[in-house]
């Protein structure tokens, strides 16, 4: 690595983990640039949570090596822990304590005392729009408020890398979008986010890069757009005012007609060049569609194509709720 190349937030080579005779991770390689959102997708049992536990030093890998901001997980676990924060799938909030008390407890764990602890708690309560509920028991908080408090507690120590393990599970759509904005704001401040999620739309909206984990191995990695281009099924849908125009367009372009809705589905990726060519052919033939829409494969199509197991169907159903 040259002196001008930024150090990655996470780099892993050949990570392996087994429980008895069950292989959970089978030689996983990862590199996550600092200041980005990386999303790890996979069906239940694919190894996502195991990966998070290894990278956050909660368990040891059986083989391979990994570094967090240059610190080796095996040789420098304390330095790794000082650089990271973890917000798990299940809230770590103590419902009997107030929001302020939860944050003060976390501050003491990070060796903040007195005015410094109170100042940090106040900053985070304000940042996460919890100041008005600071003195209320966390048990009285809504689901979205509890998740915000949970993340605020993770940030007490100002981590450079945050592991978010299914952070919006159980939240209503408005609370989920509020959490998305919080995550974007964190990254804008320079934090790196390692996100695992059951909601494919969440990864599509947030992640700079996505990896798909299946049966302990990374089966695909790239941006959401790159992954979608790997899957066939893109098409242009044309709708016409008259059956005669539909028939003429089908003769000119081919494709699949739907006489009932006067629609023609023409295979294609929807790129600018191909779309312009399609319209030129229609113009030359004096055929004018009433509507045109471009359809590309969704991330759930990618997921289902790449993970051929029973967990995929459950995953897709959750993504579409």
Q: Where are the regions a protein language model picked out?
A:
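ABC-family P-loop ATPase nucleotide-binding domain
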Residues: 1-16, 309-321
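Conserved protein kinase catalytic domain
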Residues: 81, 125, 152, 228, ...
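A short linear hydrophobic-aromatic micro-motif
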Residues: 129-130, 256, 288-293
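ABC transporter nucleotide-binding domains
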Residues: 7-12, 17-214, 220
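C-terminal coupling/interaction segments
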Residues: 270-321
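Non-catalytic surface loops within mature trypsin-like serine protease
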Residues: 34, 132, 242, 268-270, ...
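A generic structural signal for short beta-strands and their flanking turns/coil linkers
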Residues: 82, 232-236, 288
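ABC transporter nucleotide-binding domain
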Residues: 179-269, 293
């Amino acid at each position: 690595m040259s002196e001008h190349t930024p150090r990655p937030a996470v780099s892993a080579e050949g990570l392996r983990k087994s429980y008895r005779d069950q292989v959970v991770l089978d030689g996983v390689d990862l590199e996550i640039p600092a200041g980005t959102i990386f999303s790890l997708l996979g069906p239940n049992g694919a190894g996502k949570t195991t990966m998070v536990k290894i990278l956050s030093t909660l368990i040891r890998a059986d083989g391979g090596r990994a570094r967090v901001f240059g610190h080796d997980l095996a040789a420098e676990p304390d330095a790794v822990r000082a650089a990271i924060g973890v917000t798990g799938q299940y809230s770590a909030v103590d419902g009997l304590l107030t929001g302020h008390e939860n944050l003060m407890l976390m501050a003491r764990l990070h060796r903040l005392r007195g005015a410094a602890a109170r100042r940090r708690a106040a900053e985070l309560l304000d940042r996460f729009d919890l100041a008005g509920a600071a003195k209320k028991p966390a048990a009285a908080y809504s689901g979205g408020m509890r998740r915000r408090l949970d993340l605020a507690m993770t940030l007490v120590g100002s981590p450079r890398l945050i592991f978010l393990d299914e952070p919006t599970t159980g939240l209503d759509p408005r609370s989920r979008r509020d959490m998305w904005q919080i995550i974007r704001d964190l990254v804008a401040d320079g934090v790196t986010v390692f996100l695992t999620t059951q909601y494919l739309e969440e990864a599509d909206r947030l992640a700079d890069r996505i990896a798909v984990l299946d049966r302990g191995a990374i089966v695909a990695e790239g941006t959401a757009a790159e992954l979608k281009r790997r899957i066939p099924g893109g098409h242009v849908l044309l709708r016409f005012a008259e059956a005669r125009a539909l028939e003429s367009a089908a003769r000119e372009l081919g494709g699949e007609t739907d006489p009932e809705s006067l629609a023609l589905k023409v295979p294609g990726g929807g790129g600018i060049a191909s779309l312009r060519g399609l319209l030129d052919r229609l113009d030359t033939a004096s055929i004018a569609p009433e509507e045109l829409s471009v359809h590309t494969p969704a991330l759930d199509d990618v997921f289902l194509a790449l993970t051929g197991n029973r967990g995929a169907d459950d995953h897709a159903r959750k993504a579409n709720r």
